[in-house]
Amino acid sequence: MLFTFAWASLAAIFTFSIAMVVWGRNGDGTIDF
């Protein structure tokens, strides 16, 4: 259970960081990476 939760949170953080990078590059420029 704990192992599954760890993988789920890791995948969520990874997906979120990728989304933020894409948003920063293609967005309105308010978030700059």
Curated annotation (Swiss-Prot):
Its main location: membrane. Coiled coil: none annotated. It is found in: Cellular thylakoid membrane. One of its GO terms (biological process) is cytochrome complex assembly. The chain crosses the membrane at residues 2-22. One of its GO terms (molecular function) is electron transporter, transferring electrons within cytochrome b6/f complex of photosystem II activity. The keyword Transport applies. It comes from the Bacteria. GO terms for cellular component: cytochrome b6f complex; plasma membrane-derived thylakoid membrane. It is a single-pass membrane protein. Keywords: Electron transport, Membrane, Photosynthesis, Thylakoid, Transmembrane, Transmembrane helix, Transport. The keyword rRNA-binding does not apply. InterPro entries: Cytochr_b6-f_cplx_su8_sf, Cytochrome_b6-f_cplx_su8. Component of the cytochrome b6-f complex, which mediates electron transfer between photosystem II (PSII) and photosystem I (PSI), cyclic electron flow around PSI, and state transitions. NCBIfam families: PRK02529.1. HAMAP family: Cytb6_f_PetN. Belongs to the PetN family. The 4 large subunits of the cytochrome b6-f complex are cytochrome b6, subunit IV (17 kDa polypeptide, PetD), cytochrome f and the Rieske protein, while the 4 small subunits are PetG, PetL, PetM and PetN. The complex functions as a dimer. This is Cytochrome b6-f complex subunit 8. It comes from Prochlorococcus marinus (strain MIT 9211). The gene is petN.
